[in-house]
Amino acid sequence: MKVWVDADACPGVIKEILFRVADRAKVEVTLVANHWMRIPPSPYINLKTVSSGFDVADDEIVKLLSAGDLVITADIPLASEVIDKGGFALNPRGELYTEQNIKSILNMRDFMDTMRASGVQTGGPAAIGASEKQAFGNQLDRFITKNHKPS
């Protein structure tokens, strides 16, 4: 099992949690981004840079992931593709996307997109706070405990 991170939009505090977990649990974490970013020296943490462009990083993640891998993303269409390929997706606020909930979440996202396109001001998500960081860390720990078998 590997962890893939849609890193361009991933909050720094979430990356820090992932870096600590990578070393503690000895799980491979790969950040996929369209620009270079600093990562700590670790045999478990990698950076894969891709060219700029719409969904280039997303497409690379879907191409590289294997069934059972975990993807960290707030991108709901990407999460849906990951699940369709047999992977798992966790957003930076600690919500695990599953086969059971992804379609309704995707439908709500599309509805809100339609609302915004018609001029309705919907606002964006609030900044990630302590409770979201804790929810993310807890969900990540549960997932890794259940699914990762260190070699």
From Swiss-Prot:
CDD domains: PIN_YqxD-like. InterPro entries: UPF0178. Pfam families: DUF188. It comes from the Bacteria. Belongs to the UPF0178 family. This is UPF0178 protein Spea_2958.
